[in-house]
Amino acid sequence: SLIHLSDKYFASPLEEEIQWYLDSRGIEGRPKPPLWRTPNPPERVDGQPVRFNPKAVDRVIKTIGCLKHTKGRWAGKPLELSATQIAYIIAPLFGWQVWNELAGRWIRLRREVFIEMPRKGSTLASAVAMTMAFGDGEGGAEVIIGAASRDQAKACFQPLHDLATYSPLLQKAGVKTVTNEIRQPKTSSVIKVVSSRG
């Protein structure tokens, strides 16, 4: 249920809840729909209700805003998300929740995500990875980032390394960088970068 290639998912309109979120938070700009997008969530999953939680989206946006650019003219400035990034990546991924009877609480509906980013999009992908691994309140979280070659894997890892190294928020949370991994020992959570060619 991540990305479907059928016609009904090509540039389909935003869910009412996400449009309401953008309007209620005063997020300016018209989101540009991607070619493919995550389908609208069902009303129920395995008999359990699904809801949109705007506070969860607020928390993620605030967390990402605590991270800072590490390169170029924006180096040292907080990450700011565009309306498109919020509407089509952050809100659908973190806002939709399903009731989990076993945990006795609402959990994120989307447990897996595929985000294809063009070149120069690694900062957003890194921020989402950091949030999923260390800011989601889940012990033992694993985020795997794949690349075709060692050089690509290194290029994927560098922005993650830089965010972790230069973020007081992540340092305070005990996040450590090691070879090709970023770990939070107290929660056993990890981000790994792997390549298909060794």
Question: What kind of region is each of these model predictions?
Answer:
Residues 1-198:
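Phosphate/NTP-binding elements of NTP-utilizing enzymes
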